[in-house]
Amino acid sequence: MAIENNNNGVNFCTVKRPKTKIVCTLGPASRSVPMIEKLLRAGMNVARFNFSHGSHDYHQETIDNLRQAMESTGILCAVMLDTKGPEIRTGFLKDAKPVQLKQGQEITISTDYSIKGDESMICMSYKKLAEDVKPQSVILCADGQITFTVLSCDKENGLDRCRCENTAVLGERKNVNLPGVIVDLPTLTDKDKDDILNWGVPNHIDMIALSFVRKGSDLVEVRKLLGEHAKNILLMSKVENQEGVANFDDILLNSDAFMVARGDLGMEIPIEKIFLAQKVMIYKCNIQGKPVVTATQMLESMIKSPRPTRAEATDVANAVLDGTDCVMLSGETAAGAYPDLAVGTMAKICIEAESTIDYPDVFKRIMSNAPVPMSPLESLASSAVRTANSAKAALILVLTRGGSTAKLVAKYRPGMPILSVVVPEIKTDSFDWTCSDESPARHSLIFRGLVPVLHAGSARASHEESTEEALDFALQHAKTKGLCKQGDSVVALHRVGTASVIKIVTVK
């Protein structure tokens, strides 16, 4: 069995990479340097740090290990901080013993979080619970495994009398959802602010996944909090309740990226409508050219099993066909028995799904929704994709400084990979040469089809010389990575002086 697993690990290193990006949650099963190296080789593009669990020191150790693994493998990986957000949780229990609940049993829920719960009373962390729910409201616990129906509310004492609708065991500190209730909690808690400013910013994170975003103004607040760091950190919104769904367009407008977080969303809207919410959200993100991550339970059974269920394999493929930029693994990599196998399996499914897409048709659909008039840069990017599709090019090559041109090319979903050659800006005063940081390269790791590569360039070369040098470097790099071979056509997009040029080059 061990030999078989090792073989799988080796195969996954040699297969080609999918265009769809893979986000992996790092946790107890995957935070050692050797395991992170395996994940990087298997196809991890973004490492997710889930701040619902773990201390700053714990996450610091993990990110230090990630940097070491990146250094030893030479594989670039972006860092995502996922905020805990304004969660409501059940409290602690007497002697830490799980409580056995029976169907039809009545129980009191208190908002006094110091209470140690038992069969007759438990507590929840939301102070306004008794005010915001009403008789017949539903309270869901432990990812929806336990359902309570509210019978009566005592607002003065903060107590709700409830009936348990199913037999189940309740452990300590389980998450709580209140479907249809507009909850009076801030999007960013004090803990989130501390995590972002005292861990995220010093560690130069690339993106923040914001839990429970409810309106566009929430993102304005986060940008204010980040101040000068906002330009280097992408904000990815997670819509996880009905208020967020209602304000989706406003939220997307103010976000850099989006996550379809199906876990909490599945508690808030009827489970049979999740597929539609996913498709609509992904479609809207695609039209706006904003990267979108599909998350939650994608290969859930691989936490324990070396093979996913057929339904899971189909789910991953369908997310790719829907147009997702990234697919995400949570417990599968954080606490599962087969972290690297889960990544490799996901990569294989994505490659297979991508091979069935009608790319010219996708291009037409995005073009028909493109802004009028189009910005010169977007017009150029879409023309590069049209040229590459017609010329049956093996690769699109974009020389970029800030990465925005390459991202616009990715919006038009070419059938071939896009090599985004990030040429750091050389800033000079009379004493010193400095390069801008590599965050544009890491940011592009959440765009489908974008392959970033850093090119140091020669500080003293003229613009034309450095452009030619960067093009030669990029073509050589693409050949070694197997993105193109001798005789292939490559569409190159770059600047010459003040003009931008699209040209077709043949790989020598």
Curated annotation (Swiss-Prot):
Binding-site positions, ATP: 50-53, 89, 174
Subunit comment: Homotetramer.
Residues annotated as binding Mg(2+): 240, 264
Chief place of localization: cytoplasm
Pathway connected to this protein: Carbohydrate degradation; glycolysis; pyruvate from D-glyceraldehyde 3-phosphate: step 5/5
One GO MF term: potassium ion binding
Catalysed conversion reaction: pyruvate + ATP = phosphoenolpyruvate + ADP + H(+)
Name of the protein described by the UniProt record: Pyruvate kinase, cytosolic isozyme
Compartment(s) of residence: Cytoplasm
Binding locations of substrate: 48, 263-264, 296
Cofactor: Mg(2+); K(+)
Keywords from the named record: ATP-binding, Cytoplasm, Glycolysis, Kinase, Magnesium, Metal-binding, Nucleotide-binding, Potassium, Pyruvate, Transferase
PROSITE patterns in UniProt: PYRUVATE_KINASE
